[in-house]
A protein has these predicted regions:
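Phosphate-binding loop and its immediate beta->loop->alpha context
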Residues: 32-183, 192
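Short acidic, glycine/serine/threonine-rich loops at helix termini
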Residues: 20-22, 172-176, 200-204
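Gly/Thr-rich phosphate-binding beta-strand-loop-beta motif of the actin/hexokinase/Hsp70
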Residues: 2-30, 206-223
Length: 223
């Protein structure tokens, strides 16, 4: 496996997903600072824009709903589903075809999180997917967007951290890691969000944190 050029962080959010990264080969200064990936996504039929966030919505269109070419992405893929901004917009018009809050379903111990139960209120003739599959599709889209913009540094070769809520049970934690592996994320660390927030504060303080906390202090993280 190649040596990682970048350290990547993914926020697989309930409402939005985001990917940030640091160039490990860069020195001090702007080149070595954290950056945000602008994610190419469909914003209308056949229309692609780059946004700083990927809305965590999956839309399962009727086979006759879209014209040929409407779902083509910059990297050549033409899936039979939509994620991101267009999914959110179409889903507002036809909610029975919209998968949302997959992250919340992923930590719902009362359902089979591998079963095709979403959209929950959709009739049988509408396509369904599992909370696990929905999470995987968001991660796949981020992977493809990254690889499209960084062909010499494929995501599978990079060091990657995915944040999860502290409330996730062990099963939800493992399902998140499973979705990441299925999406081609080879080197994955799953980190709880409060811990990630603390690390971010330490990094942004540029050493000043040592003057603000002492050994034995309890730090409150508010999300």
């Amino acid at each position: 496996m190649s040596e990682a050029r970048y350290a990547l962080g993914v926020d697989l959010g309930t409402t939005n997903c985001a990917l940030s990264y640091v160039d490990l080969a860069a020195g001090e200064g702007d080149a070595g600072r954290q950056q945000t990936l602008w994610v190419a996504q469909l914003t209308g039929p056949g229309a692609v824009e780059e946004r700083s966030l990927l809305p965590s919505f999956l839309y399962l269109p009727h086979p006759d709903e879209m014209a040929p070419g409407d779902l083509v992405l910059p990297w050549g893929a033409q899936p039979d589903f939509v994620v991101g901004e267009l999914a959110r917009e179409r889903g507002a018009q036809t909610p029975i075809r919209l998968v949302s809050s997959a992250k919340s379903w992923l930590c719902h111990a009362g359902v089979d999180r591998r079963a095709a139960i979403l959209p929950q209120e959709a009739p049988e003739e509408v396509a369904h997917c599992s909370p696990l599959d929905a999470s995987m599709r968001y991660l796949e889209h981020l992977r493809d967007a990254w690889n499209h913009g960084h062909p010499d540094a494929p995501l599978g070769d990079q060091e990657l951290t995915i944040t999860i809520p502290a409330s996730f049970d062990p099963a939800a934690r493992e399902l998140t890691a499973e979705a990441a592996r299925a999406a081609g994320y080879e080197r994955v660390t799953v980190l709880e969000e409060p811990q990630a927030a603390l690390y971010s504060w330490i990094q942004s303080s540029e050493g000043a944190w040592r003057e603000q906390v002492q050994v034995g202090d309890i730090i409150l993280v508010v999300d």
